[in-house]
């Protein structure tokens, strides 16, 4: 295989995590930590645990975003998951998954893997709503071979 060992491990971990997407309960915070443990296995010491230190996003030397202090992370994550559980029947899954993604990335609960986990969890929320987002679903049958028209999305728009 070509590539750095860390990159190869990231791909293996992501594959393993996405294989579980159909089994994930996206409203369970402990499951989020468990899947993070899979996503970051052999890559970081705090795999599967919320961060204990401060975290920011940097562009070279410049800090472009500073996450909330680590001491607030458990409470912020509980609030986010409580909100999702409470609103999952009232808020459309497309909106719910986007709000989750935004809030999750803002909270930045882990030392590493936040972007990967946000994308995976976003997909897990959507997979509970529609099978097109499930792992292993052949997406080709959602499209018209004759016209190249995205049938699934046209039907979705008709229902909204």
PLM region spans:
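FIC/Doc superfamily catalytic core
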Residues: 1-160
């Amino acid at each position: 295989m070509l590539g750095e060992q860390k990159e190869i491990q990231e791909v293996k971990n992501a594959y393993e995590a996405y294989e579980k997407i159909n089994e994930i309960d996206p409203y369970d915070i402990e499951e989020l930590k468990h899947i993070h443990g899979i996503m970051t296995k052999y890559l970081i010491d705090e795999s599967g645990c919320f961060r204990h230190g401060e975290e920011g996003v940097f562009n070279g030397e410049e800090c472009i975003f500073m996450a909330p202090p680590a001491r607030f992370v458990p409470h912020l994550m509980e609030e986010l998951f409580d909100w999702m559980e409470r609103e999952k029947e009232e808020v459309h899954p497309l909106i719910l998954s986007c709000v989750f993604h935004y809030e999750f990335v803002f909270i930045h609960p882990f030392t590493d893997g936040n972007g990967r986990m946000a994308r995976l969890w976003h997909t897990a929320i959507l997979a509970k709503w529609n099978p097109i987002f499930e792992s292993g679903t052949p997406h080709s049958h959602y499209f018209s071979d004759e016209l190249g028209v995205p049938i699934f999305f046209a039907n979705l728009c008709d229902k909204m």
